[in-house]
Amino acid sequence: MPEETQTQDQPMEEEEVETFAFQAEIAQLMSLIINTFYSNKEIFLRELISNSSDALDKIRYESLTDPSKLDSGKELHINLIPNKQDRTLTIVDTGIGMTKADLINNLGTIAKSGTKAFMEALQAGADISMIGQFGVGFYSAYLVAEKVTVITKHNDDEQYAWESSAGGSFTVRTDTGEPMGRGTKVILHLKEDQTEYLEERRIKEIVKKHSQFIGYPITLFVEKERDKEVSDDEAEEKEDKEEEKEKEEKESEDKPEIEDVGSDEEEEKKDGDKKKKKKIKEKYIDQEELNKTKPIWTRNPDDITNEEYGEFYKSLTNDWEDHLAVKHFSVEGQLEFRALLFVPRRAPFDLFENRKKKNNIKLYVRRVFIMDNCEELIPEYLNFIRGVVDSEDLPLNISREMLQQSKILKVIRKNLVKKCLELFTELAEDKENYKKFYEQFSKNIKLGIHEDSQNRKKLSELLRYYTSASGDEMVSLKDYCTRMKENQKHIYYITGETKDQVANSAFVERLRKHGLEVIYMIEPIDEYCVQQLKEFEGKTLVSVTKEGLELPEDEEEKKKQEEKKTKFENLCKIMKDILEKKVEKVVVSNRLVTSPCCIVTSTYGWTANMERIMKAQALRDNSTMGYMAAKKHLEINPDHSIIETLRQKAEADKNDKSVKDLVILLYETALLSSGFSLEDPQTHANRIYRMIKLGLGIDEDDPTADDTSAAVTEEMPPLEGDDDTSRMEEVD
């Protein structure tokens, strides 16, 4: 609940002042800004100008459908007014303004999603200049100000004043000062050691560096002096007025003030009479527009330097780093538009946060800003691209609904995607830069393969993966194809959690032995990507963890494999009977070398890795889990001593109870090594403990065993049993 206090100065009409506490995270952020030393404090001006520009964008957009919105002020501009006497810097805009509720919510009581993320980034050593990307740029004012006053007027509300010295609270009151019409005035009461930001030269320098491409005129108001000749009488009159003025309070700084310098005199004829003249100094307000630069996207790309692109990118995005790549182009013919697209150096912290509306590409119509969150302009997988699109053909007063139906927009979108892919392909020619790009945006490329069937082929050329033959370098699918063996028909891949895990997997044993390269796909999104990417350059992509793996074989090898199948046919049948519904079938493997067995999945089911990913989904559909979960096939290695001994044991006595124990243990171990999870890990653990006891020669019936182990052994019968029952089976 806000505390309410009353000021006593107004006998006629008492002004109500409400005090609010800052939301905890915002108070923490302000404390961090105020109490930490930052060298580049100047970014506060960029942030406040950027906020003003956004407010002007909003009122201009509203006025396209309702011109009366501008009745409260036709001109859209930003003014900067330094005042050395009062040590204040004022930023005024004629934007949309804020209602009382906006003031309270936006400036203090509701934390934006970026507040905490920005504080964490700061504490991890990030630059303060990143503040704008997290949506909390306003608070950078406290880098230089000890107190901030915000006066604002929205068309739908009265004029209000917000004020805070950052002591954990702020006040809001109705403002009875000079009416603004519409817009916002931010008054910074500067700290004693920050007066450099009142200097004309310094303000110009900052605006040129950070804000010269803002789409509204930024005017600097500076009080200056100039010489003026007046007659003696006039000078005396002015002097008297000056003295009177000093006695009274200054009413307005904008009125010229004149003081006597009194030495030069000359005679001159005026209207036929001789009058004495005096030179006096007159104070006046000089107005200078600081951003007269033509919109950069309308210029010829050949005339624009890399530095200019860099400056524009930073002013557009509030990024503190240079862009990684840029594409500047125009399309002419039936449809005309210009576009300037940038690839940032790093992905934003909330790249795939769906709730947040992206505002990465600004849409203009004939140089007039329309909107910056047009979802139809670019597909989601390219949501990291920043830039501007300026159309000649869209109507100025276009609404969101019309945009969704607009054929023009569909053509623009198609061209933007095409140019982005061109840009990535150009970037791929520079190995070092592409590596940086791929580290940040590989998920976007893979999401594109999943979603954009039209451009899937081009996107697949941009993929890079580690393979069993690539070492620490990532290679393209094209590189893989050039290294394929003569009789190799497929591209082999394995999905998993880490590079080491998949490299040591049982599934790649025989392929590596035969010198066949296997692609390691170790990101969760690879599972989705590869579902859509069935082939590359006519070669099918084959998972080495699924049934029916075909490896290049000669006739001799085929014959040997058939013999092994016949030899182990009986064991496969016995194992299937023991495992029942746990597996769909048991077969002799052609993919294992050192492992006794593995679990493979059916061609159209999920891999073990995909099953793990789906189980981790908080909002998963359990019915889907039922029919998509992998149908498991157990493959045994006919050349492994464990499997050979098990075959002999089973053929000697197919009712041997220990065979069942061993088969279940093999199956559960294969589940784990193949990337699946156990439904009942405790039972599996108990089996392993019993084997350890046997290995250590511990007699489970030993009366000297402590109570705890006795309690455990009740649940864990020994491996060897009598003729009637297998104790291992009892645990099941």
Curated annotation (Swiss-Prot):
| Name of the protein in its database record | Heat shock protein HSP 90-alpha
Primary gene name? HSP90AA1
Q: What is the effect of changing residue 93 to A?
A: Impaired ATP-binding. Strong interaction with HIF1A, MET, KEAP1 and RHOBTB2. Loss of interaction with HSF1 and ERBB2. Los of interaction with TSC1
**Residue ranges, annotated region (Essential for interaction with SGTA and TTC1):** 729-732
What's the effect of swapping residue 313 to F? No deffect on the interaction with TSC1
Q: Which organism is it from?
A: Homo sapiens (Human)
UniProt-annotated stretches for the region Interaction with FLCN and FNIP1 = 284-732
Recorded E.C. number(s)?
3.6.4.10
**Phosphoserine-modified residues are where?**
231, 252, 263, 453, 476, 641
Task: Give the UniProt family note.
Answer: Belongs to the heat shock protein 90 family.
The catalysed reaction is: ATP + H2O = ADP + phosphate + H(+)
What PTM annotation applies here? ISGylated.
* One of the protein's GO biological processes: protein import into mitochondrial matrix
Could you tell me what this protein does? Molecular chaperone that promotes the maturation, structural maintenance and proper regulation of specific target proteins involved for instance in cell cycle control and signal transduction. Undergoes a functional cycle that is linked to its ATPase activity which is essential for its chaperone activity. This cycle probably induces conformational changes in the client proteins, thereby causing their activation. Interacts dynamically with various co-chaperones that modulate its substrate recognition, ATPase cycle and chaperone function.
